[in-house]
Design a protein with these regions (language model features):
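Gly/Gly-Pro-rich "capping" loops immediately C-terminal to redox-active cysteine motifs
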Residues: 163, 175-205
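Flexible coil segments in periplasmic/lumen-exposed cytochrome c-class electron-transfer proteins
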Residues: 123-156, 167-168, 215-309, 526-565, ...
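Beta-propeller blade termini and top-face loops
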Residues: 548, 553-865
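Beta-strand-rich N-terminal accessory domains
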Residues: 249-456, 473, 487
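Sequence/structural segment immediately N-terminal to covalent heme-attachment motifs in c-type
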Residues: 156-176, 205-209
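Detector for the c-type heme attachment site
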Residues: 173-179, 195, 208, 232-234, ...
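Central antiparallel beta-sheet cores of small beta-barrel/beta-sandwich binding domains
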Residues: 23-110
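Extended acidic/polar, glycine-enriched regions
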Residues: 477, 485-541
Length: 865
């Protein structure tokens, strides 16, 4: 049996009016099955036809389970049903309005008790309420709604939808049990009596029409309103405020207003594709034609999962996906795209279609063990490998690290090709890189004519000491070129661009899918190659709006006061605001924060005590940012593919050039290899951690490591190995390190690791090149083992550096990504071994998990996200 998500009373009821039930057993019986410490709830429904009975076991999350071989003799019942695929036998006895018995699953028996559903002795009479809107105001939308049907259709899917609505909207005002919302007087479902009625229909009226300071929730559909009511009733009221849990009975449903429509259904939930990421989005993509591409394949268990043979799959591991057609909504709303892979300086391919990608991925649609893939028609592609030949030899042979599965990973040698960064100017995305000593600016584009789509690559190439060669597409693809000093040849199955040594001149490539008409006339009519320098000076801001939010002051009657600094969840770009890093500018009133969806935001008003925060989006389209650091007023961001230095070239508070400060990162298609945290030592060197492959053995040396990047960004060094999920870095006062790790394969519990020196191994035998000895003697012991029940996912640690924290100044904090807590780490050293324990800071329970934090140098307070 799979684990129940929540103990819920059955709300899927057949209407049996109490006055119509003549058989003492016929009707609905609320049941509870106890399995160890867990309880599974639902209803048993019995109907009599002549002398025989039919029945079902109806569970909130399992649906309807038919009772077969049902036998009722006197007050005894026996029958069979399937529970989550397991055959079960129910056997028990009725006694007046109660039922007791057992459910047998295999060789195990579990107790079941049930009580007949009945009407309350006194009919419920909801209060008279003065709503904000009148019945007339909502007549058009609510006049024919089947409320009984909507309540009766409650399901686990509805509960999950309601949870998403509550935790993305309602929580801001109402909060949760441990954390007060932004409006202290907002109703507390878990402890207070309802003023406007506590039955589902009255709650619906409150949501639809508004009451008191709560405005009508006009954007919610009828289904969504009842979804969030279900979540509130089952998650808060039933658990903690049971006196306010209204029993939904057949007679209650019969009294509700009649209607034949269930109104608008819940809106599809896909915030990952609704978001406007800007005109580019960096990620790892697989390019595949939706109709003819290689079928997606993932190895089955057992763990460690064996390597797939992906040598024929076209992965752009550091793929810059660029939207080519005009229009609002960013890359996700486009119809045509190209991907540039900055690992190897190649255009991986171009495609058209509806939807951009399939959005598969842990930080996209929350899916594990997968990666995003293009959807639509693939017009052309190039193989994984160098896009430009080695300028010294003219060879395309790939010299990069070869993994166990035969694939190559990591960037090309910088003397061969070197990615410089990306300019974002209006709708133009200009990619800057070098091949040999030649500096290149490249713009991807698309043009239409004569009934066909033609993709373009405009290149501005500085003079080169050597002639250059670039693979454009497979032979058979329709390719043409304009510009001086460039020609096309067929070599080894590919159309190859040859660029001779020449004075600076622009080149324009035209590429159309095989079978399209000749490009000769198209090229004659097309615009000439464009000079791209004008896009490197800084353009008008893409995100001009600033957004204001409130600071909700916390109570000061406990050990700690926690203020809630609300992000702008409602924003024009539908950014999900999943904050993943924080730091401060020289003016400590200004902070910068990154998000997992690729944004960087600047927030003003942190220390001026006005209670208003002003937010501005200053960067977008980055690859899973999970760390941010300000050094000398320069903003550095840890991304999965690179460390990015944000450059504002014209002073308008928005990034014009995304400089690749370091791109030594080795990136594979695996979903779990996050690059996490960002810290700097006194010399200016930068540090981040890279996670391993979850339930798989490492493929690359950087899997599960602590990494050092030199202060000039020119080199990366592995400091420590053997991590599974290293969520960030802490630098100690003596410039040793602390890195946490999460429980899982080879980690019996979560670890807090104190790291001194270089080259040591920290326990995950599925890391790269682990020791032969699998015993504890071969690995460094942690500072603390952290039990999963105490903190299921520790993140980054931070030393307290604030006199405002009194006796805790100089102590060590640990953030809980899993439980939204902050903990104090108590440590000592015995015989050279650092050891200790962790305790929760009293009264600190946050609305979300905590991953990063910094102490503000001005007010001395901790800011965490």
């Amino acid at each position: 049996m799979r684990q129940n998500y929540l103990l819920l009373s059955l709300l899927l009821l057949t209407v049996y009016l109490s006055g119509c039930v003549t058989d003492p057993l016929e009707g609905s019986w609320d049941y509870t099955i106890r399995v160890g410490q867990e309880e599974f709830s639902g209803a048993m429904k019995l109907s009599k036809n002549g002398s025989s009975y039919t029945g079902t076991m109806v569970s909130f999350d399992m649906g309807e389970m038919l009772l077969t071989n049902l036998r009722i003799a006197g007050n005894k019942l026996q029958g069979d049903f399937q529970w989550d695929g397991d055959p079960c036998i129910i056997d028990g006895v009725f006694q007046d309005a109660n039922f007791e018995g057992t459910v047998q699953v295999g060789q195990s028996r579990f107790p079941i008790v049930a009580t007949r559903q009945s009407e309350p002795a006194k009919p419920y009479d909801p209060p008279v309420v003065q709503y904000i809107l009148s019945d007339k105001d909502v007549k058009d939308s609510d006049g024919n709604i089947d409320h009984a049907g909507l309540i009766g259709d409650f399901s686990m899917e509805g509960y999950k939808r309601g949870g998403r609505i509550y935790n993305s909207n309602c929580i801001n005002c109402h909060g949760i049990q441990d954390v007060e919302g932004s409006i202290p007087t907002a109703h507390k479902f878990w402890s207070q009596a309802f003023k406007a009625g506590y039955d589902p229909f009255s709650m619906y009226q409150t949501i639809s029409k508004g009451y008191g300071v709560m405005p009508p929730q006009l954007t919610l559909t009828h289904q969504e309103k009842y979804d969030v009511i279900l979540y509130i009733r089952e998650n808060f009221i039933k658990k903690s405020n049971n006196d306010q849990y209204f029993p939904v009975t057949p007679a209650y449903l019969a009294r509700l207003p009649k209607g034949s429509s269930k109104g608008l259904e819940a809106k599809p939930y896909h915030p990952w594709s609704d978001m406007d990421y800007g005109n580019f989005l960096i990620n790892t993509y697989e390019l595949a034609d939706e109709k003819t591409g290689i079928k997606r394949f993932h190895s089955p268990g057992p763990t460690p999962y064996p390597d797939e043979d992906y040598r024929q799959n076209n992965f752009a591991y550091k793929g810059i996906a660029v939207r080519l057609d005009a229009g609002p909504g960013g890359v996700s709303a486009g119809k045509a795209w190209m991907i540039f892979d900055h690992d190897v300086m190649r255009v991986a391919g171009a495609w058209t279609g509806e939807g951009f990608i399939d959005w598969e991925g842990i930080l996209l649609n929350d899916k594990h063990e997968t990666y995003p893939r293009t959807i639509g028609q693939l017009h052309f592609e190039t193989p994984v490998g160098p896009g430009w030949a080695n300028p010294s030899t003219g060879s395309f042979e790939d010299p990069r690290f070869t993994a166990r599965d035969g694939r190559h990973f990591g960037p090309l040698p910088k003397t061969w090709a070197n990615y410089k960064g990306l300019y974002h100017h209006g709708d133009n995305v200009i990619i800057s890189y070098s091949v040999g000593n030649a500096a290149i600016l490249e713009k991807l584009g698309m043009e239409r004519g004569a009934g066909q789509i033609v993709f373009t690559r405009t290149l501005n190439i500085s003079p080169s000491r050597e002639s250059l060669k670039m693979r454009v597409a497979a032979v058979g693809t329709n390719v043409a070129v304009s510009g001086n000093g460039a020609s096309l040849k067929e070599e080894d199955g590919y159309v190859v661009l040859h660029v001779s040594t020449f004075s600076r001149a622009p080149i324009k490539l035209f590429i159309a899918k095989p079978g399209s008409s000749s490009l000769d006339e198209f090229v004659k009519r097309a615009s000439p190659p464009e000079l791209l320098d004008r896009y490197t000076k800084g353009g008008a801001p893409h995100y001009q709006e600033t957004l204001n939010t409130n600071v909700t002051k916390g109570k000061e009657d406990g050990t700690f006061a926690v203020d809630l600094l609300t992000p702008p969840f409602q924003n024009p770009w539908k950014s999900r605001m999943k904050l993943s890093g924080i730091d401060f500018m020289k003016n400590p009133d200004i902070g910068v924060l990154c998000t997992t969806d690729g944004d960087v935001w600047k927030v003003t008003g942190l220390t001026n005590n006005k209670g208003i925060l002003t937010w501005k989006r200053i960067a977008s389209g980055l690859f899973q940012p999970l760390g941010i650091k300000v050094l000398n007023e320069k903003i550095y961001v840890t991304c999965r593919d690179q460390l990015v230095l944000l450059r504002d070239l014209n002073g308008d508070d928005e990034t014009d050039f995304y400089e690749s400060f370091n791109h030594d990162h080795q990136v594979t298609d695996h979903f779990h290899e996050f690059a996490m945290g960002l810290q700097a030592d006194k010399a200016g060197n930068l540090y981040y951690a890279k996670s391993g492959r979850h339930a798989r053995e490492a493929l690359i040396p950087q899997h599960g490591t602590l990494l050092k990047v030199s202060k000039d960004g020119s080199a990366t060094e592995i400091i420590a190995t053997g991590f599974r999920a290293a969520n960030g870095v802490c630098i100690n006062p003596d410039e040793s390190f602390i890195v946490t790790d999460q429980q899982g394969y080879w980690n019996p519990m979560n670890r807090v690791n104190w790291i001194e020196g270089k080259g040591k191994f920290y326990g995950n035998m599925w890391g790269y090149n682990p020791p032969a000895d699998t015993s504890g003697a071969a690995m460094e012991q942690p500072l603390v083992w952290v039990d999963m029940e105490f903190d299921r996912s520790p993140s980054e640690l931070l030393w307290v550096n604030s006199k405002k924290w009194g006796a805790l100044d100089g102590s060590l904090l640990s953030f809980s990504y899993g439980y939204g807590k902050i903990q104090l780490v108590l440590l000592e050293e015995i015989n050279g071994q650092k050891q200790g324990g962790v305790v929760d800071l009293p009264g600190v329970k946050l609305l979300t998990g905590v991953m990063r934090g910094r102490f503000n140098p001005s007010d001395g307070q901790l800011y965490a996200c």
